[in-house]
Amino acid sequence: MRRLVALLACCTSAAAADLRLGIIGTDTSHVIDFTKLLNDGSSPEHVPGARVVAAFKGGSKDLPDSYKRVDKFADELRTSWKVEFVPDIRSLCPKVDGVMLESVDGRQHLEQVKQALACGKPIWIDKPLASSLEDARAIERAAKGRSPWFSASSLRYGKDVDAVKFPNISGVVAWGAGPLGREPLDLTYYAIHVVELLYAVMGPGCEEVTRTHTDNSDVIVGKWKGGRTGEVRAIRPDSDYGALVFRDGGKVAISPNIDDGYRPLVEEIVKFFQTKRPPVPNEETLEVMEFMNAAQRSLSLGGTPVKLR
């Protein structure tokens, strides 16, 4: 009997130690996928250490991907996962230890980050970091010295990505789905996943970008310091994901998939909330935005090479 009591006490203590997370924006399927991984302790895919306990619904009235889904996902969080809903972002602050900004509309991110900073808690920002480079830089300025933040695509943690981070890479060709979104940065809608895959392998250091466009694809070629090159092929209407990594003496192909599961990403998100240290440096995340901004400028100039800075 004493063993049972001790075991129950141990389990209760472990559950009590879970970080409490609050969601901003319930207009993406990520809010359901992430909550299942965090809150379902009986699942073999369970990620321990944090739980979603509260949410602010949010939503964008002029974006179909938002207004067609925001209520549906909010209802599922409320009924299936007993997540408490609050009327505004400020009301999340006393209820949570960390904030997950999930709003599908990147145009909202800067203003929502500014409000979330009042909580003084770490902030996870789902892709894209922002809808423009200017907003991304404004997020960095606003958060500096106040709250740590982290943003990434799940493809950074896809199958075999870590295995090809060779020290002698000369170039990478990455490809995947490339439906285009709205300007100012149309790559932030979906092709950002391929850009993130490229950066996961290449690392930062891109200096110049050239972009060409056809009806069924965009090709963006970046020149890195030291003469390395990285290429993104954003394919429409859809594509699997992959990368060909060139190194001294040969090449290696990998096939990560965005549908492989979000568990590796969610594990990194929980570690971030625990340590308050982003696994992807903020400087690299901002360079991803600079890469897409330079690609947009190159496109507007008819494919002329554009410097990142």
Indicate residue ranges for each PLM-predicted region.
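Short helix/strand-capping hinge loops at secondary-structure junctions
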Residues: 120-122, 127-128
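A contiguous active-site-proximal alpha/beta segment in oxidoreductase catalytic domains
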Residues: 129-184
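C-terminal helix-rich "cap/oligomerization" subdomain common to oxidoreductases
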Residues: 99-100, 272-309
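Sec-dependent N-terminal signal peptides
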Residues: 3-13
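Interdomain hinge/lid region at the active-site interface
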Residues: 239-277
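Rossmann-like dinucleotide-binding domain that binds NAD(P)(H)
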Residues: 172-240, 283-286, 290
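N-terminal glycine-/serine-/threonine-rich beta1-alpha1-beta2 phosphate-ribose binding loop
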Residues: 17-119, 141, 204, 224, ...
